[in-house]
């Protein structure tokens, strides 16, 4: 287990660290990944764990690759929680007109279509053969980085740290072949990335009444590699779960920004993935990184609010004056193999927890032995429960109780919480997001609020929730705000229910979810960049600027208070934004 004070050393990005491998540690199942802020002493950690190597993400964040054999058993401690990569998954389950986009495409003076801007989609890849991503000059994709492909060349000689990179000329060459995959062997195996890229920046297809938000934008596509097996095991995910590591997403953002700079284009990034891990306070490494890059001039990050609003995967409790104990009941499905729970309690309270099995047996969680792992062994059920109690989680100041259930008995489990000092405080409990746990495992007293997934809790992101553009109703599954400390999220609502999307191998279908809303918002951001930067109306536009302009122009109902936890500042309407400017 890594305990070296969260690896916060003193070192520059250009420093070279020894640790050459015969295989790429970023892709190897023999290495564990740890996200670090490396202004302190990474070299000490590398000496502590022989065979360790380092890869910078940017001038603040980097990744340590540590051999699993020298690491010991992975566990959550006060120093390692934020270093262990969280895992993210997909947030999905005639839209363009509802957001004021098509009126701007055809406006006699504006005619905004994303020309001169770049849209990056960081997801499952893309069907690069699809006609909605091609024009008379060939592919509209400038860069396609597939992190999952193995490259047999010298690692140090490639432009990307792992996987394979294909440029527009490679893709154009592939499109001329009878078997394009013999030249560019990158595939979108589930269609999610293709759908998002189409919504954000697909070509106009009048016969299908379809258009992407920014049909003339240049595309940057990153296919994120699957999470390593050791992390999937640690988080107890189902074998078929599609999850991605935080550090790989961060690396994708960093390279997308560098390529946009080479293209000399403003960049709109789309993140249609999310996670319920963390305190929902914007302190996950990915959320912090999104905050950092969205303050850059000419970079915007649009994020899905998540689809956890109706999953019953979140519960909360408030200790008011004189209230001594709160009980939360958890129904566990039959044949549930395992799952994690994160309990986050507001400071300065000290929380005392006990867990009761379906047979009535109660075991206490110790708050006095530090963060080392506690094993709770129940006599009448075969379930093993492992707990780490972190009194002061150092990124937030909150108390974190990290609970892992192995082979949990089906039935009703109870979590008893007491406040030792009886402060007026609140706690939150989150299960994994839908798709990473059985739908029949849920809280009996859930709360739909504070369910926006990370990195939708980042302060500078544009976090998009979803609504039905045909009748104007909110998407029932959409994550709701605010954050535990009252920060406003989501920021905007965009169409995200039964939206027409391009499919892998051609044709069109429909998808729903907040990732769809995030994609449309990313395309809208590209249109704003075209107006502001390409046409020199606001040359120092940042991601935060995009958010503020869209919030100001959002459509709001007269009988509703804004912002609010369901709609944020209202329904995105770019045309109305320009009406206000005039």
Label the predicted regions:
Residues 268-269, 286-321, 572-574, 579:
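Catalytic cores of secreted or luminal carbohydrate-active enzymes
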Residues 152-155, 160-167, 311-398, 418, ...:
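Extracellular S/T/G-rich loop segment that most often corresponds to the catalytic His/Ser-adjacent loop
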Residues 380-421, 427-433:
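Beta-sandwich interaction modules
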Residues 197-200, 209, 220-228, 257-267, ...:
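Hydrolase catalytic cores
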Residues 107-245, 337, 348-349, 458-460, ...:
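Subtilisin-like serine protease catalytic core
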Residues 1-118, 125-140, 411-413, 442-445, ...:
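Autoinhibitory propeptides
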Residues 82-87, 251-281, 304, 420:
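Short acidic, glycine-rich surface-loop motifs adjacent to enzyme active sites
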Residues 123, 306, 513:
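Active-site glycine-centered loops adjacent to acidic/histidine catalytic or metal-binding residues
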């Amino acid at each position: 287990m890594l305990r070296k004070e969260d690896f916060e050393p003193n070192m520059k990005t250009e420093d070279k660290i020894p640790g050459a491998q015969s295989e790429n540690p970023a892709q190897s199942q023999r290495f564990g990944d740890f996200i670090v802020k490396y202004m302190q002493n990474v070299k000490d950690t590398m000496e502590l764990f022989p065979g360790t190597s380092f890869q910078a993400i940017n001038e603040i964040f980097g990744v340590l690759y540590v051999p699993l054999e020298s690491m010991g058993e992975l566990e959550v401690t006060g120093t390692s929680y934020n270093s262990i990569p969280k895992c993210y998954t997909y947030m999905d389950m005639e839209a363009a007109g509802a957001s004021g986009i098509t009126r701007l495409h055809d406006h006699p003076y504006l005619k905004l279509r994303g020309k001169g801007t770049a849209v990056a989609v960081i997801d499952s890849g893309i069907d690069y053969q699809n006609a909605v991503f091609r024009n008379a000059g060939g592919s509209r994709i400038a860069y396609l980085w597939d992190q999952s492909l193995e490259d047999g060349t010298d690692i140090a000689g490639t432009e990307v740290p792992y996987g394979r990179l294909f440029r527009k000329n490679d893709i154009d060459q592939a499109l001329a072949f009878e078997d394009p995959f013999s030249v560019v062997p990158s595939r979108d195996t589930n269609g999610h990335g293709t759908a998002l890229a189409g919504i954000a920046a697909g070509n106009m297809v009048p016969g299908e009444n379809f258009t992407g938000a920014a049909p003339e934008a240049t595309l940057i596509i990153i296919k994120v590699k699957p999470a390593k097996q050791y992390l999937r095991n640690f988080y107890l995910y189902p074998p078929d779960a599609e999850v991605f590591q935080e550090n790989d997403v961060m690396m994708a953002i960093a390279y997308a920004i560098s390529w946009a700079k080479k293209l000399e284009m403003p960049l709109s990034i789309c993140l249609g993935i999310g996670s319920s891990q963390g305190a929902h306070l914007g302190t996950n490494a990915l959320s912090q990184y999104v905050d950092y890059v969205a303050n850059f001039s000419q970079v915007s990050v649009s994020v899905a609010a998540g689809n956890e609003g109706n999953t019953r995967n979140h519960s909360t409790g408030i200790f008011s004056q004189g209230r001594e104990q709160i009980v939360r009941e958890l129904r566990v499905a039959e044949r549930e193999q395992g799952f994690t729970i994160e309990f986050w309690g507001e400071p300065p309270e000290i929380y005392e927890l006990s867990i009761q099995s379906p047979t009535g047996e109660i075991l206490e969680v110790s708050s006095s032995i530090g963060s080392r792992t506690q094993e709770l062994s129940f006599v009448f059920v075969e379930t093993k429960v492992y707990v780490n109690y972190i009194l002061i989680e150092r990124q937030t100041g909150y108390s974190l109780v990290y609970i892992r259930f192995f082979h949990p008995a089906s039935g009703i489990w109870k979590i008893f919480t007491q406040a030792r000092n009886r402060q007026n405080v609140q706690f939150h409990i989150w299960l994994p997001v839908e798709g990473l746990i059985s739908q029949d495992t849920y809280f009996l007293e859930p709360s739909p609020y504070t369910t926006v997934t990370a990195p939708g809790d980042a302060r500078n992101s544009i976090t998009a929730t979803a609504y039905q553009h045909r009748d104007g109703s909110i998407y029932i599954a959409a994550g709701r705000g605010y954050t535990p400390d009252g920060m406003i999220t989501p920021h905007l609502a965009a169409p995200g229910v039964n939206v027409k999307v391009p499919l892998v191998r051609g044709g069109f279908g429909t998808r729903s979810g907040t990732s769809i809303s995030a994609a449309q918002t990313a395309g809208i951001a590209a249109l704003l960049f075209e107006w502001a930067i390409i046409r020199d109306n606001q040359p120092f536009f940042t991601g935060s600027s995009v958010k503020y302009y869209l919030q100001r122009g959002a459509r709001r109902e007269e009988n509703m208070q804004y912002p609010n936890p369901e709609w944020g500042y209202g329904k995105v309407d770019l045309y109305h934004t320009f009406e206000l400017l005039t």
